[in-house]
Structures are given as structure tokens and as C-alpha cells.
Curated annotation (Swiss-Prot):
Organism of this sequence: Psychrobacter cryohalolentis (strain ATCC BAA-1226 / DSM 17306 / VKM B-2378 / K5)
Cell location: Cytoplasm
Family that this chain belongs to: Belongs to the class-II aminoacyl-tRNA synthetase family. Type-1 seryl-tRNA synthetase subfamily.
UniProt pathway annotation: Aminoacyl-tRNA biosynthesis; selenocysteinyl-tRNA(Sec) biosynthesis; L-seryl-tRNA(Sec) from L-serine and tRNA(Sec): step 1/1
Protein name: Serine--tRNA ligase
Amino acids binding L-serine: T236, A237, E238, E290, S388
Catalytic activity: tRNA(Ser) + L-serine + ATP = L-seryl-tRNA(Ser) + AMP + diphosphate + H(+); tRNA(Sec) + L-serine + ATP = L-seryl-tRNA(Sec) + AMP + diphosphate + H(+)
PROSITE patterns referenced in this protein's UniProt entry, alphabetically: AA_TRNA_LIGASE_II (PS50862)
Keyword ATP-binding tagged: yes
Keywords: Aminoacyl-tRNA synthetase, ATP-binding, Cytoplasm, Ligase, Nucleotide-binding, Protein biosynthesis
Length: 428
């Protein structure tokens, strides 16, 4: 959530900043509701002052032996008015909070202004796309020919946008997870965590998925009476890992905190009808290794650069060409103030596709979660960062396509071989 103070002053600059994100700030609404809040605040304070003055007068009357019953009755009436005013103010504050929850984060100053992915800015490239001397096959064809990727079985078991992996492809999927976790924990000092795959609504509000993006989530229902439960399947491990510090006061000496986890992720893909219907690109259930950093305001910019580099290192070790782009204002996620996307080269599509997104959310999530940093007697809001390190299914398909051979086999990247019993190739 953005700083509420920004909604109480001149809203023109804020409106212009949010407009670059495709969000229209209703200035009239916020001015009217702020005037209403001020009026209620003044009314409440005046009534409280009247009650305090009356209480002193009652004391004086009683001390002098005079009758205070009339004044006591008046003060009782004032107390009732105060309760009514406080209830009205509390209700209004809740309305303000709910409305503020719908506002996206403010872009950082160095984020390029744009409306779509076409306006993203390439920062760097690594690796040269391989030149093939045979007809390139996509990962779906490769996996199905090997008999190790089965969409038909997944459709029978569940429905569309699911998959079944078998044999060495399933092993490589597991090997990728192990390699990623080892890299983040051993090389980069992350603390590995095992977190619930089901979270409550407060967790999703904390990281910004609720209330705005409920349609993208899978919500659980009580099968006995069809009542909604306050449980959702996680769309990313960012949600449980970031919420580990919800409501906490963190000692500045302990920061940054660096968490990593491997989890399945569950997304309804409500807004992607007809997109990437073939293959592993866009699934309702997929695996991801996630990175989360909890930091101070002074640390967060540098940590975003480091986190992005850590995700890039995984791709370098797998010898997968990629490019890194800085997202424009109109393409960033709701909670982010700055984001880098890493896009891996897919030979069958002759283009780069997103495989990681690394974001600095500033104090946006921390404000929603109530997470603060203690520095002596001073406290301030923490900064939160998250990044994919990496999306496992997309990494698997990138390995399959970039390391395919003419005979339909797949050369196993050297760093994965220790996790696959020393095998160096997946054969037909």
C-alpha cells in the first residue's frame, strides 16, 4: 500500500505517476473522503474536549458540594455522541484503507515510462543462440517423442494446462530444483525454507494479491457445506516467505534476511485465455524456486541488482542464452516499484520468453504487513524484494530446446549430471 499521507495532499503529481501504470486516480473521490475524514476527526476531538472540560467542572461542583446531576447527564449524552463519532470515523477509515488497497505501487524514478512489454528496455544479453544444422523441434514434440511428457494423461487426470513428466525428464526437473536451491543457499547464503502451499487471505493482502486479483487465485471451499474458507493455494512462494515477517519488528543488524524455497505454484490464468495453450509455458500448476529479501530502504536497490544477477547465474551455468530487461511502468506487477525480467532464448519460437521476474517492492508490502525495522529507538518500514530463481518448468523446456540433438536426444547440462546419476544424455 502506498503511503496514506500521499492521498491527503496535492494529488496531481500522484495522479500523473500512477497514470503511467495505467491506473486512474479519482482525485474527486479522495478529496471528498479526506474532507469527510477531517470533519469527523474535528467533530470527535471537539466532543472529547467537551467531555474533558465537563469532567473537570463536575469535579469542581462535587468538591464545593453543589448539584452536578444535570452536568453528569449532559456528559453521558456527550459520551454517547463520542462513541457514535468514533464508530463513524472507524468505518470511514476502513473505507479509505480498502480503497487504498486498490492502488498500485509508485514506480521508481529510473523506471522507463511505457504501456506494454514493447516499451521495456533491454539491459544486457548473455550467450549466443545456437545455430542448428537440423530442423528445430519444440519442447512438446521432443518430450512426447521421448515418451516422457504426457499432456493427454494430465488432461484425463485433471484438465487442460497440466502435465505429467516421466523418466529422465522428471529426474531433470528434480535436478534443476536441487541445483537452484544449492546455488542460492551455498553460493549466495540464502536460508532455505519449507512453507505451506495454502495461505490465508491476510497473507495475500500483505503481498498485494488481494483484494485486487482474487480471480487469479484458487480458493478452497469446505466440501461439507460449500462455505468459503479463508484459504487459498499459493500463486508463488513469495506470499508465504514474505509474510514470515508480517507484524514483526526486525533488528537492523539482522538485515538483510534472505529466504529461498521450492514450491508448486497455482494460478487460474484467468486473463490468458487462448495464450500459450500448447506446452509448458503457461500451466495452472508449476514449480518455482523463489528468492525473497527483507531489507532496509538503503539496502534494497543494491539487493535488486544482486538478486537479478543470482537468477542470471543459474542460466549461465546451464548455458542458456538470455536477455535482461527493465520493465516499463505499464508492464510491472501491482506491488513492484522496479522490476527486471530475465528472458531465456527459445529456439522453436526464435524469441526470448520470461523465465524470471525480480522486483523491489520498496515499503509497499511492508506497510500492508506492518513490518518495521528497529534502529535503536527509531523504527521505519522494511523494504521487500522477490525474484524467481527460477521457474522450473520453463527452465526445463529451455534446456530441452537449446540442448536438443538431431536424433531427438537431449544433452544434459554438466551442472545437472551429479543430480542425475552421472548421465550426460537423455536418449530415445
Amino acid at each position: 500500500m502506498i503511503d496514506p499521507k500521499l492521498l491527503r495532499g496535492d494529488l496531481t503529481d500522484l495522479q500523473q505517476q500512477l497514470a503511467t501504470r495505467g491506473y486512474t486516480l479519482d482525485i474527486a473521490f479522495w478529496q471528498n473522503i479526506e474532507n469527510e475524514r477531517k470533519s469527523l476527526q474535528v467533530k470527535t476531538e471537539e466532543l472529547q474536549s467537551r467531555r474533558n472540560t465537563g469532567a473537570k467542572q463536575v469535579g469542581v461542583l462535587k468538591k464545593s458540594g453543589e448539584d452536578a446531576s444535570e452536568l453528569l447527564a449532559e456528559m453521558q449524552s456527550v459520551s454517547g455522541e463520542i462513541k457514535t463519532a468514533e464508530d463513524e470515523l472507524r468505518t470511514l477509515q476502513e473505507r479509505i484503507s480498502q480503497a487504498a488497497m486498490q492502488i498500485p505501487n509508485i514506480p521508481a524514478a529510473d523506471v522507463p515510462v511505457g504501456t506494454s512489454e514493447d516499451d521495456n528496455v533491454e539491459v544486457r544479453k548473455w550467450g549466443t543462440p545456437r545455430e542448428f544444422d537440423f530442423e528445430i523441434k519444440d519442447h512438446t514434440h521432443i518430450g512426447e517423442t521421448l515418451g516422457m511428457l504426457d499432456f493427454e494423461a494430465a488432461t484425463k487426470l485433471t484438465g487442460s494446462r497440466f502435465n505429467v513428466l516421466k523418466g529422465q525428464l522428471a529426474q531433470m526437473h528434480r535436478a534443476l530444483i536441487q541445483f537452484m536451491l544449492n546455488t542460492h543457499t551455498i553460493k549466495y547464503g540464502y536460508t532455505e525454507t519449507y512453507v505451506p502451499y495454502i495461505v490465508n487471505s491476510e497473507s495475500l493482502k500483505g503481498t498485494g494479491q488481494l483484494p485486487k486479483f482474487e480471480d487469479d487465485l484458487f480458493k478452497l471451499t469446505n466440501h461439507t457445506n460449500n462455505d468459503d474458507m479463508d484459504f487459498y493455494l499459493i500463486p508463488t512462494a513469495e506470499v508465504p516467505m514474505t509474510n514470515l515477517v508480517r507484524g514483526e519488528r526486525l533488528d537492523i543488524k539482522e538485515l538483510p534476511l534472505k529466504f529461498t524455497a521450492h514450491t508448486p505454484c497455482f494460478r487460474s490464468e484467468a486473463g490468458s485465455h487462448g495464450r500459450d495453450t500448447r506446452g509448458l509455458i503457461r500451466q495452472h500448476q508449476f514449480e518455482k524456486v523463489e528468492m525473497v529479501n527483507i531489507a532496509t530502504a538503503e539496502q534494497s536497490d543494491e539487493l535488486l541488482e544482486a538478486m537479478t544477477g543470482q537468477a542470471e547465474f543459474i542460466l549461465q551455468q546451464l548455458n542458456l542464452p538470455y536477455r535482461t530487461v527493465k520493465l516499463c511502468t505499464g508492464d510491472m506487477g501491482f506491488a513492484a516499484q522496479k522490476t527486471y525480467d530475465i528472458e531465456v532464448w527459445l529456439p522453436s519460437q526464435e524469441t526470448y520468453r520470461e523465465i524470471s521476474s525480480c522486483s523491489n517492492c520498496g515499503d509497499f508490502q511492508a506497510r500492508r504487513m506492518g513490518t518495521r525495522v528497529k534502529d535503536g529507538k527509531q523504527t521505519s518500514l522494511a523494504h521487500t524484494l522477490n525474484g524467481s530463481g527460477l521457474a522450473v518448468g520453463r527452465t526445463l523446456l529451455a534446456v530441452m530446446e537449446n540442448h536438443q540433438n538431431a536424433d531427438g536426444s537431449i544433452t544434459i547440462p554438466e551442472v545437472l549430471r551429479p543430480f542425475m546419476g552421472g548421465a550426460d544424455i537423455i536418449l530415445l
